[in-house]
């Protein structure tokens, strides 16, 4: 064995002491100085901002243990699409990050997500998806016990609980999946959101799917991002089902809905929008499919709607019954013609109507009252039928004339252009009818 001299052994001992005690201590001291110096938080903000493509501000950064970071008071801001300034899109009181093998897990507290409008919020998320290919990660997991979602309007603020999500950073098809509970009064429904961007398609295609999974139906105000539900469906209306949105390139979003609208107030749906007519009661609308999107020779609107409307115990105006018979070929029971002329409305026990509005503007109608009545019966009182579906097809043109009687319009005007009648521009009609309607509405 090679003999070691005393000086050599002393040198080895000194080197080992430096390597295993002094150097680690120096490295720890240097690391502690670096993360505690005044400029460290700013360095972290810049690095995070570079990775996310956002402006990041922090109140504090902590390192509880190796592989774990804690950001306090984090705020994310994004440049406006027109480049006029920065807008806040997210903030959290505390975010705890745990790193794994190309995986990141985030636990957020006091989380708030913001957008100036639903459309802008979608644009913000789309911008983040575009940059996802630059992330050095395959998966990001997110958990938050509570979250506030603010889409820029008093009626578009939602409280969300038990949020759990994952982002798959697939270069060809980045996908975000989120499960959550909408914390609305009287509702604890579990919901799911899936957002992806198919970069392999030409043009690039984005899709967003929202669905209810279990629990009671949601308050219909969750649809306020699309229309004012209280003004259309009533304050007590609820919704359940699946809403799928899709966008090709930079075009407008198409929509496809399947589900149920529950506790719809018919007085709000009809009487408030079409003051010439009366209809009351509480209805359920089972939507097999309703599609919204771009249409040839027409602006964006409804392309198709199929489902069933059912209601029990309500009233219907005699004028509305007569207009349905005159313009849409509904068949009325002889007892309607024998009503007292002074009577303006008729009580009904049940209303059941199956409908299919096609892209051509044709409407196929049938009864939906079950086996107790004939397949074409749509309205009954306590003892007998009151109205039957048309023998053939009806049309959106006839529906327009039913809702807005021509006799009430000025001479030469098919339908007066009002806030109520603008919805007609969203209905599918035959091209020749669309051209005539467009001139009439546009000329007012």
Task: Briefly describe each language-model feature range.
Residues 68, 73-75, 110-114, 141, ...:
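Small-residue helix/turn framework positions
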Residues 100-104, 118-121, 150-158, 295-301:
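Short acidic, Gly/Pro-enriched loop/turn segments at secondary-structure junctions
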Residues 50-59:
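A short, amphipathic edge element
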Residues 131-138, 159, 170-175, 180:
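Extended, helix-rich scaffolding/adaptor regions
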Residues 441-444:
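Short, solvent-exposed mixed-charge patches
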Residues 1-51:
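N-terminal type II signal-anchor transmembrane helix
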Residues 62-147:
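Flexible beta-edge/linker motif
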